[in-house]
Amino acid sequence: VSVDCSEYPKPACTMEYRPVCGSDNITYGNKCNFCNAVVKSNGTLTLSHFGKC
């Protein structure tokens, strides 16, 4: 399972709630929040699955 984060980071994310679960076992509210965290982690954070952790 993967997410294309090539257009991130973005300065602001919408409040849209479409949860994704990161490899850090944290539920991110949407792809934007998740991708910003991926960029911040220098690519060490990956997608575990779609939906809550």
Swiss-Prot record:
Gene3D superfamilies: 3.30.60.30
Protein name: Ovomucoid
Glycosylation sites: 42
One Pfam family of this chain: Kazal_1
Site positions per UniProt: Reactive bond 3: 15-16
UniProt keyword Secreted present: yes
Primary location group: secreted
